Amino acid sequence: MPAATTSIFYLPDINIAPWLESPTSPSGQQVVDQVRKACTSTGFFQLTGHGLSQDVVEDIFAASAKFFALPKDVKQGLNFTKNLGFRGYELIGAQVYESDVLPDLKEGFLAGIDLPFEDMRVQNKRFFAGQNVWPPPDVLPYAEFREPVEKYYKSIMQLCFTVMDLVAATLPYGPDVFDEWKSHEPACPLRLLHYPPTPAHVAGKTRQLGSSAHTDFGALTLLLQDSHEGLEVLNHDTGDWVLVPPKPGAFVVNIADMMTMVTVGEYKSSKHRVINRNETEDRYSVVFFMDGNVDYKLRRLDKIGQPIGDDEDLLTVEDYMLGKRNSTYVK
């Protein structure tokens, strides 16, 4: 592995346009250096210059707001725990990451790659393998929800693969080091999230958060925030929570647990949380998780084929993700 970088709290804004235009140019290499520094410190950065249409971004936020405004019974009819592949509506309080706090004050909607029912991954109930579910079109027309979600999913998948290639460029293992991880219609959940206004008597307390403190489980995450603050990253050196301010058109990118595993801790997966401190307004975010090819084996990048830790057999993406999912959702 490359030599470890001294840990500092570094959460930069990075314009990747120079790298997209000319990866080997001095300005392109400067982007690579910035991303590497972010990956080895907090694992977080704000990404701009990505080229994803602002119309697509605005449409996904509008679609999300319309969905979460639906009657409770309509949303509960799409309960993700009753659908193959964990697709559909996630109830408020369905998840909690910490043992000493109340379940999270958020609701969600999950979608992904649509696989036909006959696909053996669906039949065998593999991780996140299934078909998307949608509100009835007479309740929420496809043009107002399904189509914007599907369009956004296609766009964000392409951007995610670009970011994976950029992260690969920060490592000494070649540009194709993550190709297998990205292959075979990877498990990449798209999660629309709604954080209701937080009552004044709750906003200053930590017993119930919008999203309790956690690290993400996959390879990396791409997050869109609306204009409302809420996302905070833990500074491990000081114990302080640092606000990640919303920036129009920017994606928050963060390294997740499996990337930390394969880089043997060099690339950091930092704890973060969400508190909607607004007492009157809703907060929305759109999260894309790059979990990857469910059969991909989580091997050290510098020692291909050797197990991580003391395991006799290498964990797969599916092994790791199922364990994490089962431990964070309220039974």
UniProtKB/Swiss-Prot annotation:
<keyword id="KW-0560">Oxidoreductase</keyword>
<feature type="binding site">
    <location>
        <position position="272"/>
    </location>
    <ligand>
        <name>Fe cation</name>
    </ligand>
</feature>
<comment type="similarity">
    <text>Belongs to the iron/ascorbate-dependent oxidoreductase family.</text>
</comment>
<comment type="function">
    <text>2-oxoglutarate-dependent dioxygenase; part of the gene cluster that mediates the biosynthesis of the selective antifungal agent ascochitine, an o-quinone methide that plays a possible protective role against other microbial competitors in nature and is considered to be important for pathogenicity of legume-associated Didymella species. The pathway probably begins with the synthesis of a keto-aldehyde intermediate by the ascochitine non-reducing polyketide synthase pksAC from successive condensations of 4 malonyl-CoA units, presumably with a simple acetyl-CoA starter unit.</text>
</comment>
<feature type="binding site">
    <location>
        <position position="283"/>
    </location>
    <ligand>
        <name>2-oxoglutarate</name>
    </ligand>
</feature>
<keyword id="KW-0479">Metal-binding</keyword>
<dbReference type="GO" id="GO:0051213">
    <property type="term" value="F:dioxygenase activity"/>
</dbReference>
<dbReference type="Pfam" id="PF14226">
    <property type="entry name" value="DIOX_N"/>
</dbReference>
<comment type="pathway">
    <text>Mycotoxin biosynthesis.</text>
</comment>
<dbReference type="GO" id="GO:0044283">
    <property type="term" value="P:small molecule biosynthetic process"/>
</dbReference>
<dbReference type="InterPro" id="IPR044861">
    <property type="entry name" value="IPNS-like_FE2OG_OXY"/>
</dbReference>
<dbReference type="InterPro" id="IPR050231">
    <property type="entry name" value="Iron_ascorbate_oxido_reductase"/>
</dbReference>
<dbReference type="Pfam" id="PF03171">
    <property type="entry name" value="2OG-FeII_Oxy"/>
</dbReference>
<keyword id="KW-0843">Virulence</keyword>
<dbReference type="InterPro" id="IPR005123">
    <property type="entry name" value="Oxoglu/Fe-dep_dioxygenase_dom"/>
</dbReference>
<keyword id="KW-0408">Iron</keyword>
<dbReference type="GO" id="GO:0046872">
    <property type="term" value="F:metal ion binding"/>
</dbReference>
<dbReference type="InterPro" id="IPR027443">
    <property type="entry name" value="IPNS-like_sf"/>
</dbReference>
<dbReference type="InterPro" id="IPR026992">
    <property type="entry name" value="DIOX_N"/>
</dbReference>
<protein>
    <recommendedName>
        <fullName>2-oxoglutarate-dependent dioxygenase</fullName>
        <ecNumber>1.14.-.-</ecNumber>
    </recommendedName>
</protein>
<feature type="domain" description="Fe2OG dioxygenase">
    <location>
        <begin position="186"/>
        <end position="292"/>
    </location>
</feature>
<feature type="binding site">
    <location>
        <position position="216"/>
    </location>
    <ligand>
        <name>Fe cation</name>
    </ligand>
</feature>
<feature type="binding site">
    <location>
        <position position="214"/>
    </location>
    <ligand>
        <name>Fe cation</name>
    </ligand>
</feature>
<keyword id="KW-0223">Dioxygenase</keyword>
